[in-house]
Amino acid sequence: IIAEPWDSTTDTAISTRVSKLFADYGRNFYGFITATSATVSDDEILKIAQIVESSADSHIYGITLTDLACANSVYTDESTDLPSKLKRGQFTRTIVFASEYDANDSAYRLNKYLVASALGRMFSVNFSGSMTTITLKFKQAPSLQPTNLTQSQDTNLSARNVNKYAIYSNDTYIIQEGVMSSGMWADERHGSDWLQDLIQTTVYNVLYQSKTKIPQTDDGVARLMAAVANAIDQAVINGFVAPGVWNSDPFGDLESGAYLEKGYYLYAPSVNDQLQNEREARKSPVIQAGIKLAGAIHSVPIIVNINR
């Protein structure tokens, strides 16, 4: 855990501190929140979100919204509240939670850290196991109080891609919906970052651990592709990737509508087709992967036909 104290009355802008934190320790952490009793302005939060989005290293930035004023207004393209700006900015690495908070009420005092609880649950996933991946929806936030929202408030927050820890009519408390500010599912953001890191590490280890070299030949590229396949196989084992129909653009021999029996498809052109300058720079031909995510079921339509 890296803690950076900040005092709004004496310190430089918090976004400046975050930039320095990234420069000094960016590869040593993944998720972070702005946890401070001082007020962080919307402009500063937007700057931090931009820093996170453009960072060379993968990070997730969490915000707990304790001012629920935006829950009382319908979202439009002209809405000026913070969640609306983050949504329109299509920030895929920022996640916002709304939570009822009262500094004078011991039951609600910790609610300003709701996003920390949610990220803690998400980051506890062990991707090395079998069927271990999760969806953030339906999870609990131990020791924190749910927010009692009206239907219209819930709708208004959801329209802004704001998550909640809500009370349901069957007396259960759950996190919903589990999305980033862009609308991307949070578990897919997390899983994609994990898989990217695993592929990079696995391929690097092939180069690093070879007692001779990986030749710049089709056989050499095949060894690298095997390493990529190894990494994605673990994503199949842990439930992040699954067999399914490829509905995106075609590439290589993969056509739109094709069924991916393994959950993924790998392609690399022949070394013989490489540009000479790439060959002289000792680059591998580009390796492409088409991956089908397993997704998650969040709702169930049920039709009951009754006959007498």
Where are these regions (language model features)?
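A broadly used, surface-exposed interaction patch
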Residues: 1-21
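A structural detector for beta-sheet-dominated domains
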Residues: 4, 35, 267-269
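Structured, hydrophobic secondary-structure cores that serve as assembly/anchoring elements
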Residues: 177-308
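A glycine- and small-residue-enriched flexible loop/hinge signal that marks low-structured segments
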Residues: 24-212, 243-245, 249-265
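Residues that cap or initiate secondary-structure elements
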Residues: 9, 38-40, 68, 272, ...
